Amino acid sequence: MRFMLMAAMASLVFTACTTTRETRLYDALGGAPGVAKLVDAISAEYRDDARIGFLFEDTDQDYFKARLREQICAISDGGCEYTGLSMEEAHSGMDLSEAQFNDFVDASRRAMTKAGFAIGVQNRLLARLAPMRGEVIHQ
Amino acid sequence: MLRQPSPLIALLLLPIAPLHAADEGRLKATGGLVTIEAAAGGGLVPWAVMAGSSTRPGVDVVAGFSATQVADFRLASLGLSASWNDRFELSLGRQQFTVDRGLLPAGIDRRIGQTVLGAKLRIAGDLIYGDLPQMAIGLQYKHSDSDVLAGALGARRNDDVEAYFSVTRLFLAGPFDRNWLLNGSVRATRANETGLLGFGRIGDDDHALVGEFSAAMFFNPEFAIGAEYRQKPDGLPGLGESDWRDVFVAWVPNRRFSLAVAWVDLGTIAARPDQDGVFVSMTGNW
């Protein structure tokens, strides 16, 4: 009985892993239309956020969204080339704190939830954005 | 009457927490819960995280209450924990262990209290970011009120200091594309039943190195399921002290409040076997 249970759990883990690993993140996000929807949601959420919205007062929204679409496409294996500033350059002079970075994470999660992205896809995208933290904060 | 803190104190304190909402800080759930020994962690096991959600610079104070009911015993614990700059944590815990009616002759106090004063220092790494997992060292000074009972059972003393080292990491998008928290701690201890039955024993006064482990999977940012295992020393002769384990569900609706419900298996306590039951824990922060 215990063996059966373990076998069932193992096969569950195996299937879950293979199904998710087979899906390119870019496709899981819904390809170009999905990424566009995601970026619209994220930029709106950032702009309206009480704590980080002020950082976007002078931002050219169209330019910002175009670069963010490229970047998300690039890091999700969608094959795009990111043509914007480096992360250090883009956040230079802002001196973002760790708390503000966390506000961005929270806002991104809210935006993705509102836009209907599943938790697993949210986690995968955030896992790929997380390594950039060092290039974003305290610049 | 500080010797026997009432659960009511915690219940009175906790609802205040959301009014003093910390509006910014770390991501929620990254402060863990207040453990039975007041340090931030899971239910039974301290983690390398700092209580609450302070970042640099910042101070955060957390209050927690837990209640454990197994076959023949109850354990209530109340903890206060403060952290500075996501670096250093001080905690104060008060536990009350109660033996169920009928197990002891009339006239003997069925309650044992213990005070735990803790300090924890984050020494390296980060819970989520960078190459290294978060690491911390901690000390816990424990004072058990059970000098007579513990002495009669063979314990050498009723207060002692324990040291531990914890490594904790949140893995983003692990199996099932879920975020997983893993913790491993090593503790040097001479405690009998975490100190409730004193420390050391006649004929063996060495510290034991014990391992304590937690694993949790976040279904989503609000709900996690997990398990813990806490190794314990051999204990007093004839009492059959066991390792402790639990399986829990945690609800973290925001940065200020969390609730965990667990099934705990405390094995044999004071020669009474099959001590499994329910554990409930609440943590709120300012």
Q: What is each of the regions a protein language model found here?
A:
Chain B
Residues R245-W286:
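C-terminal appended segment following the main domain
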Residues A22-G174, F219-F223, P233-G235, G240, ...:
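Transmembrane beta-barrel domains of Gram-negative outer membranes and organellar outer membranes
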Residues M1-L33:
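Cleavable N-terminal export/targeting peptides
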Residues A155-G235, D243-W244:
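Detector for outer-membrane/organellar transmembrane beta-barrel domains
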Residues I16, F65-S66, R201:
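A generic structural signal for short
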